[in-house]
């Protein structure tokens, strides 16, 4: 039988920076960020148009994989210092390089295949922000880090500049100790959010969030309350992470070459994005997580920045 230690060793060999395990046999959903918190968040309509967040399978891991016994949570540090020349537009740091779904997904696929070669009868599913799974909860419970007041997972080693994935398996594995919270009395992220999207510690209202509106919303126009406070952001927003003391102190450049600041979007001007054609969109977003933002939304976002709060 393959051990938890052997799994972690192999996962680290694949390049994952953090690996932890949750033993579902002993897991109890009584922590602040669990199912009850998700239900309260949904009841308040804080998911906006993200209907998939209400998928009932998200509230029970065994509905995702019948017979699930363990969750292997993994993380990759994606932090990159500001590139030179400086970007012409503000884009969330996670999207500066290649699509993280593919970068983590390839590694998780290999991990799953290796596990099955060790234990052929076991079953598994892996996800990278792609299924009805509470990624952050499992990362916290696996000891990867803790869910910060800005709702991102913070690790002692890398701050919150980490991308998460998980492999759910029917294997019975020894779990790790859940991570304790180290936000303390700090409220810098709440104070810094220009739209007040962090309505209380650990609770983000997507309806007020710049990242949500610039990436997920398909509305023809951004709400006035969002457009007036974009502060240059055309795709995502890192404000709450940039002010976090853990990030300011512990951020370190990633060794993952795929996360290097290579996206041509970084050197595309607001004026170009404001008139972006479908053909140019196809070229600029190829291989990027920001392909999720369609050409009409890029034009909408850039036009809103230009008309409200230009970023030079």
Swiss-Prot record:
Pfam families: Fer4_16, QueG_DUF1730. Keywords: 4Fe-4S, Cytoplasm, Iron, Iron-sulfur, Metal-binding, Oxidoreductase, Queuosine biosynthesis, tRNA processing. This is Epoxyqueuosine reductase. HAMAP family: QueG (MF_00916). InterPro entries: 4Fe4S_Fe-S-bd (IPR017896), 4Fe4S_Fe_S_CS (IPR017900), QueG (IPR004453), QueG_DUF1730 (IPR013542). Monomer. Residues 176-203 form the 4Fe-4S ferredoxin-type domain. It comes from Thermosynechococcus vestitus (strain NIES-2133 / IAM M-273 / BP-1). It catalyses: epoxyqueuosine(34) in tRNA + AH2 = queuosine(34) in tRNA + A + H2O. Catalyzes the conversion of epoxyqueuosine (oQ) to queuosine (Q), which is a hypermodified base found in the wobble positions of tRNA(Asp), tRNA(Asn), tRNA(His) and tRNA(Tyr). The lineage of its organism: Bacteria, Bacillati, Cyanobacteriota, Cyanophyceae, Acaryochloridales. Pathway: tRNA modification; tRNA-queuosine biosynthesis. Belongs to the QueG family. The gene is queG.
């Amino acid at each position: 039988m393959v051990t938890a230690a052997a799994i972690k060793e192999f996962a680290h060999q694949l390049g994952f920076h953090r690996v932890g395990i949750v033993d579902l046999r002993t897991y109890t959903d009584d922590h602040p960020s669990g199912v009850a918190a998700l239900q309260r968040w949904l009841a308040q309509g804080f998911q906006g148009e993200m209907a998939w967040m209400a998928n009932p399978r998200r509230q029970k891991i065994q509905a995702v994989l019948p017979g699930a016994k363990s969750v292997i949570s993994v993380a990759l540090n994606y932090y990159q210092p500001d590139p030179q020349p400086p970007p012409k537009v503000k884009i969330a740091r996670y999207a500066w390089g290649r699509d993280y779904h593919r970068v983590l997904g390839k590694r998780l696929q290999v991990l799953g295949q290796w596990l099955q070669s060790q234990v052929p009868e076991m079953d598994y599913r892996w996800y990278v922000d792609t299924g009805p799974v509470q990624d952050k909860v499992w990362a916290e419970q696996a000891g990867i880090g803790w869910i910060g007041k800005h709702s991102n997972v913070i690790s002692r080693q890398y701050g919150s500049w980490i991308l998460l994935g998980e492999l759910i398996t029917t294997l019975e594995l020894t779990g790790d100790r859940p991570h304790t919270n180290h936000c303390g009395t700090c409220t810098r992220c709440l104070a810094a959010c220009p739209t007040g999207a962090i309505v209380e510690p650990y609770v983000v209202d997507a309806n007020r969030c710049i990242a949500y509106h610039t990436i997920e919303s398909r509305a023809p126009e951004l709400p006035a309350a969002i457009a007036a406070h974009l502060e240059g952001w055309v795709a995502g927003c890192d404000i709450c992470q940039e002010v976090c003391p853990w990030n300011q102190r512990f951020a370190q450049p990633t060794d993952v070459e795929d996360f290097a600041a290579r996206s041509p979007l970084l050197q595309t001007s607001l004026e170009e994005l404001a008139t972006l054609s479908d053909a140019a969109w196809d070229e600029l977003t190829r291989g990027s997580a920001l392909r999720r933002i369609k050409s009409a939304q890029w034009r909408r976002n850039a036009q809103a920045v230009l008309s409200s709060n230009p970023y030079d």
